[in-house]
């Protein structure tokens, strides 16, 4: 429940334009960032490659990465990983799914690969995370 609320807060902050001294900032970078974050929300279970998201915005991967980094201070892959980890935590804490089912829902080839991804991102295995939460 806490994570679901967190995802809503993050999404709300992302979608709202940035207030600057000269008014609202609707720069190209922010526009690309908002579309990217919406796409990550909609497609991260299917594709987690930066190239996929760059193609959706009709720009090269290199240019896309520069735009996202300038707008957010983060690399696109970091944003994708953070979202996938939040999604995974939410699914694990729901109690409705096993680790294997969460791996399948998130589009991982197998639960071992998902476990490695989760541990590298959080420092804990999915099982350890569920026991501690």
What are these regions (language model features)?
Residues 64, 113-114, 118:
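Short hydrophobic/aromatic patch on the recognition helix
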Residues 47-50, 54-77:
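Charge-rich, low-complexity intrinsically disordered segments
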Residues 23-33, 38, 74-83:
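Short, Lys/Arg-enriched anionic-surface-contact patches
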Residues 5-19, 35-49, 68, 72, ...:
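Basic, amphipathic alpha-helical hairpins
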Residues 57, 106-107, 118:
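Core residues of bacterial helix-turn-helix
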Residues 116-133:
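…primarily DNA-binding HTH/wHTH and HhH modules…
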Residues 70-109, 131-133:
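Terminal helix-turn-helix DNA-binding modules in bacterial transcription factors
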Residues 51, 62, 98-101, 111-112, ...:
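Residues within helix-turn-helix
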